[in-house]
């Protein structure tokens, strides 16, 4: 079982009731998004997320690859990347491709972020603008950090204020590093933007994002993603939320599925 909640104009939440269902629904949503885009415009442009949770989703996608109508029409991009070799366990590209190679996507449709290139952000933006109609991804996969960051958009960093560029290098002082990341202008162009929340350690930040009474300002980067025309879609594992927090939401905004 899972419950779909229209929380507000900019956020839709899918609360899964079993950990295994979380991965299953995330994978099905990805495959459905791919098939819909391929049917509608002959290609699926997706920005992948790093982290452990997406790797589980990728594995399930590969297991169910026979449900993809045409993997050769998939174009892979990344939402952010560390300054790490592609052979490193820190490389979002390397970790994802160790799994997604089994989809047999043409190499010329796989675009990694070249963090070793000082002009890499500019080059990646040009790729997005040249390859993707209107620079609008069909799907953008996001994670949620315990501090409320998403992609490599951390609080108190310059990338949060970027209004024009779609891709930047973002200095993250508290991590003593720099990362390449998509920006809010790029994410806001996305057709289907999904954030995956898994782990009991995410419960405090999720509660703070949705149930901080009396707080009007947006404290966390993740809160700046959703838009009225394209609400942020949350897929949430059961250990990451307290169901009691949602009891006061009217049933007209809830729908049980499965």
UniProtKB/Swiss-Prot annotation:
Top enzyme class: hydrolase
Catalyzed reactions: 6-phospho-D-glucono-1,5-lactone + H2O = 6-phospho-D-gluconate + H(+)
Species: Chlamydia pneumoniae
GO terms under biological process: carbohydrate metabolic process; pentose-phosphate shunt
Enzyme Commission designation: 3.1.1.31
Main function: Hydrolysis of 6-phosphogluconolactone to 6-phosphogluconate.
Family matches, as Pfam families: Glucosamine_iso
NCBIfam families (UniProt xref): pgl (TIGR01198)
InterPro entries tied to this protein: 6-phosphogluconolactonase_DevB, Glc/Gal-6P_isomerase, NagB/RpiA_transferase-like, PGLS
RNA-binding found in the keyword field: no
CDD domains: 6PGL (cd01400)
This protein's name: 6-phosphogluconolactonase
Assigned protein family: Belongs to the glucosamine/galactosamine-6-phosphate isomerase family. 6-phosphogluconolactonase subfamily.
GO molecular function: 6-phosphogluconolactonase activity
UniProt keyword Hydrolase present: yes
Keywords: Hydrolase
Transmembrane segments: none
Pathway: Carbohydrate degradation; pentose phosphate pathway; D-ribulose 5-phosphate from D-glucose 6-phosphate (oxidative stage): step 2/3
């Amino acid at each position: 079982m899972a419950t779909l909640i229209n929380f507000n104009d900019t956020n839709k939440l899918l609360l899964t009731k079993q950990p295994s269902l979380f991965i299953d629904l995330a994978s099905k949503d990805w495959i459905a998004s791919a098939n819909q885009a391929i049917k509608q415009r002959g290609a699926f442009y997706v920005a992948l997320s790093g982290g452990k949770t997406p790797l589980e989703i990728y594995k399930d996608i590969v297991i169910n690859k026979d449900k993809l109508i045409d993997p050769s029409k998939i174009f892979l991009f990344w939402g952010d990347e560390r300054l790490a070799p592609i052979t490193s366990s820190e490389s979002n590209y390397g970790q994802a491709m160790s799994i997604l190679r089994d989809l047999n996507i043409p190499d010329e449709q796989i675009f990694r972020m070249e963090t070793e290139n000082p002009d890499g952000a500019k080059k990646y933006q040009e790729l997005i603008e040249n390859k993707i109609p209107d620079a609008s991804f069909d799907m953008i996969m996001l994670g949620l950090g315990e501090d409320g960051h998403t992609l490599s958009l951390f609080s108190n960093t310059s990338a949060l204020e970027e209004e024009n560029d779609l891709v930047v290098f973002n200095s993250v002082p508290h991590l003593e590093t720099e990362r390449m990341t998509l920006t809010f202008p790029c994410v806001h162009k996305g057709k289907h933007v999904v954030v995956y929340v898994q782990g009991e350690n995410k419960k405090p930040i999720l509660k703070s994002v949705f149930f901080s009474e009396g707080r009007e300002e947006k404290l966390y980067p993740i809160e700046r993603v959703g838009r009225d025309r394209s609400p942020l879609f949350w897929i949430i594992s059961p250990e990451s939320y307290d169901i009691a927090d949602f009891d006061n939401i009217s049933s007209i905004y809830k729908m049980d599925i499965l």
